[in-house]
Amino acid sequence: MKSIIESFNKINSNIKKLQQKNPVNIIAVSKTFPLAHIQPLIDYGHNHFGENKVQEAISKWSYIKKDNKKLNLHMIGKLQSNKAKDAVKIFDYIHSLDNQKLADILFKTQVNENKNLKYFIQVNIGNEFQKSGIPINELDAFYNYCTKEINLDIIG
């Protein structure tokens, strides 16, 4: 079985072969894996990790993030409004911003916590009711609200 470092290096090598104009950050999805499994990658110098559950992220990452300020934690799953306050405390990026209520909670909490997270708006381009994401016809208004009215740092 390949080590986590070997797998990381292979992925990184394949990305470099593509000769991208802009740098690419690999987000190692660490959900469900214990910290002991991920630690070699942290020790190797990788610093972007993705989790899809707030409580799992808190229990796994709270201690190690205090000692390693270079670690960046990405919330890659659906974020429920009732978990938003806790999410701001542990995550650096939210990849699933999809409604105004959530945006408002995240903004207020990041002000209270003196943090500045980076956000990706999740868009439901197929307008499928069973899927998350802001409908595409509401995207411009939502983006303007987030960036101009409450000043969230939308990066994607």
Where do the PLM segments sit?
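Conserved alpha/beta-domain cores
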Residues: 1-156
